[in-house]
Amino acid sequence: MAPMNPPRLQRFPATASADQIFAAFKEDGCVVIEGFIPPDQVARFSQEVNPAMEKITVEVTNDGNSNDRTKRFSKCAIASPTFRNEIIESDLMHELCDRIFSNPGEGMGYHFNDTMVIEVQPGAPAQRLHRDQELYPWWNSMGPAGPECIMNFFCAVTPFTEENGATRLAPGSHLWPEFTQINERDCPQFGKIETAPAIMQPGDCYLMSGKVVHGAGHNTTTTDQRRALALSIIRRELRPVQAFSLSVPMKLAREMSERSQTMFGFRSAVQHCDGDMVHFWGNDGKDIAHHLGLEAPSVHI
């Protein structure tokens, strides 16, 4: 059942250990990490994506769909050197991803699904409540015991306030016994879900399981453009929304670290099965990096 008391989000500084943050993630399905991106990186990143964001027109439909008064931009790796050289090199991000997705001795168990700037305009309506794992519809059938398929580091680029529509999350909803579509009237929680706003300053983020019920709030302001950077990460066995290895130029990919190349699909993920090495997203049984002319990895990512 939905929580009886008003929910609250646990908060930790980015200096906290990955184990502390992961414990809160397991308990609530979501947790705020304060100072996840350093202030100077946030400022430079925002400046670097500004030209692209200014070219995007806003569709106003008044029907509450995903395009209503919201700008979206997914070519962060192309537009922003700060993004590809600094933000995605966060050791804390990878330490948490390893705890959520990876198995010992099997390399990176995850890669990027999308990396998107989301800018919610004044007057934007509230988003319907949903779970991100509904992107892969069959996952809900596994309920709370199912493995994580998708998670998100949702980072504030501008302040998140209740007035400008900060995301509303339902802590603990990753443990509800039934994962039905929560907007259907046969859902036990239909119309009863209590949520908490993710109030954040630029550089803060909330880490959220794909099982957690959430939705953007109503931007009731007349001036606030609420900008975020969503780092959506999925299990390596799943196909991502963005075809990064086809859209990001090789010139930029060559400048990335080995683990970032893997995150964007320029290197294969490695898994050991019955003594054999299997390459996900490989080429003729080998790491796709060989086909692309990248240097051999120093370790099996």
Curated annotation (Swiss-Prot):
The keyword Cell inner membrane does not apply. Belongs to the PhyH family. Its cofactor is Fe cation. The keyword Transmembrane helix does not apply. It holds the Pfam family PhyH. GO terms for molecular function: dioxygenase activity; metal ion binding. This is Multifunctional dioxygenase ausE. Its EC number is 1.14.11.-. Pathway: Secondary metabolite biosynthesis; terpenoid biosynthesis. Keywords: Dioxygenase, Iron, Metal-binding, Oxidoreductase. The record marks S232 as: Important for reaction specificity. Substrate binds at R72, Q127, T167, R226.
